[in-house]
């Protein structure tokens, strides 16, 4: 009655035993499916409620829990309902915009989730919610004022006018720059208590506290608004050789000039560099080598010959340097001022020029 089906194969072959292998019938499949209880997805362990209430763990997603059962503890679909009939956690079915599920370690919005391309779901290390306060600012738009991605950029484009600071002079009562001021002029109603002599709210008062006296240097330094200029590199990292930026305008290096030496030439490193260049030029060097002769000293951060003590960085006396190209002392091989001198030029043998080269290149008779 329930004889197993057989598989008929066409063609001859030595493996005839596989043609009589029994197959699973449809009745056997029905019996196997009926052995699994239909209420298995609705079963709830006794420790699940403790995990949900005390450990604050969300065991089931909102899509897995039956909303009818969670509201009325009964479902018209009964055991055939495809969703679970369990008591939901307090983290389920939260209103839109709720921050109860927000992980404190996640502070940035996932840029892939904004396009619907994040595959990590709840395992993602970034926020899966649209929060403008947590979207990082576009570095290119903030630096250059435009972004090549345009509207497709996944980062925040902040208007530069919004990031302007408030004018501290206008907040005190008057700004001499008027509409030409680059800072924000926020209008506030004058505080009547402050005009009468005292305001108990102090700095927390939302109204304006008009002051007739100019701000002192001490008040500017203690003000919560940044009214002083930013620190220069010399002030932030300390002073040293070549740093004299007193006013923070970057003119420290330009204002420093070496004192005049002999024949009106600058003394110190400049004179030493110029002397080395003149030596190279007197030896038959090319014109471009005169200015480049001083480059090794600047590259390695050391002063030229004759420089004063106290400089920083690498030092090398040019009188001890031997050029491996021309064999002369006083310069490096990459700054050799004698390109026409015979010798080994980095593996290429250069012979004498002029008539000797013409005689060498002249075709010989048979």
Curated annotation (Swiss-Prot):
UniProt keyword annotation of Nucleus present: yes
GO cellular component: nucleus
Keyword entries, A-Z: Metal-binding, mRNA processing, Nucleus, Repeat, RNA-binding, Zinc, Zinc-finger
Subcellular location field: Nucleus
Zinc finger (CCHC-type): 321-338
Biased composition (Low complexity): 212-224
Zinc finger (C3H1-type): 60-88, 104-131, 132-160, 161-188, 190-212
Chain spans, region Disordered: 1-20, 211-255, 343-366
Keyword Kinase in record: no
A UniProt-annotated Pfam family: zf-CCHC
Cystine residue pairs: none
A Gene Ontology molecular function term of the record: RNA binding
Composition skew (Gly residues), residue ranges: 344-354
Gene3D superfamilies: Zinc finger, CCCH-type (4.10.1000.10), Zinc finger, CCHC-type (4.10.60.10)
GO biological process: mRNA processing
Family to which the UniProt record says this protein belongs: Belongs to the CPSF4/YTH1 family.
Function, in words: Component of the cleavage factor I (CF I) involved in pre-mRNA 3'-end processing.
Protein name: mRNA 3'-end-processing protein YTH1
